[in-house]
Each structure stands twice: as C-alpha cells, then as structure tokens.
A protein has these predicted regions:
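Short, C-terminally biased terminal segments at protein or domain edges
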Residues: 1-127
Length: 127
C-alpha cells in the first residue's frame, strides 16, 4: 500500500480512534469537571495523532522517526493518565481496558512503522 497522505498511515488511523475514545471518556460528568486531567489526557491523545501527521511532512526519515517517537510517548502518557481516571472512578474498568488497549495497539503500530522506516524505506529527499 502506497502512503500518499498522512491519513493513509495505519498508526494515524489508530491514533485518531484513540483520540475519539479519550474525548468520549472525558465528556462523562465527573471526568469533565477535572479540568487538569481532562486537558492532559486530551492533549496526549491528540498529540499521538498530530505528531504522526506533522512528521509525515518531514524532509527525511530520521526526522519523521523523531515525530513518531513523540507520538509513541504520547500513547504511553495516555495509558498512565487512564490509571488516574480509573483510580478516581471517572471511568469503569471496562472503559479503562478498552482505551488502554487502543493506546497499546496505536503504540505498537507506531513502533512497527518506525522499524519499517529504519530498515526498508529509502531516505526522503528534499523536493
């Protein structure tokens, strides 16, 4: 499959779904009132998606990989923040597990894409 747009990247698609899930959780009444955690987890989820898109416009694969690493770290941040939401009883164990696993799938896809770029993709050249 040829990647012509950032939307074609599987990791971006998974990050978009992660962001959708996080925004859904943060609309819950108790969660929505914890502005600090709500903003932090929304920012982290969005960052996973946005860094993939931003990195897509990089001039070189090493630069793209740097943005993908940021995206991967943001997924881990979401996972950590989900524990706070669970501990504060803002979300159920089922919601925690579902969203945690979405973050894990996204993180794995990003990691796989990083490895692909390192091993197989030719270096991008400046147009």
């Amino acid at each position: 499959m040829k990647i012509e747009r950032f939307e074609d990247i599987e990791a971006w698609q998974l990050a978009r779904e992660l962001t959708r899930k996080v925004y859904g959780l943060t609309k819950k009444p108790r969660f929505s009132k914890d502005y600090g955690l709500k903003n932090q987890i929304q920012d982290a989820a969005g960052s996973s998606m946005h860094n993939i898109a931003e990195g897509f416009d990089s001039e070189t694969n090493p630069e793209f990989i740097r943005f993908l690493r940021y995206a991967k770290r943001s997924c881990t941040e979401v996972q950590s923040e989900l524990y706070v939401a669970l501990d504060e009883k803002y979300i159920s164990a089922l919601e925690f597990n579902d969203t945690y696993e979405q973050a894990a799938r996204t993180r794995a896809a990003i990691y796989g894409f990083i490895n692909y770029l390192r091993k197989y993709a030719k270096r991008k050249t400046v147009n």
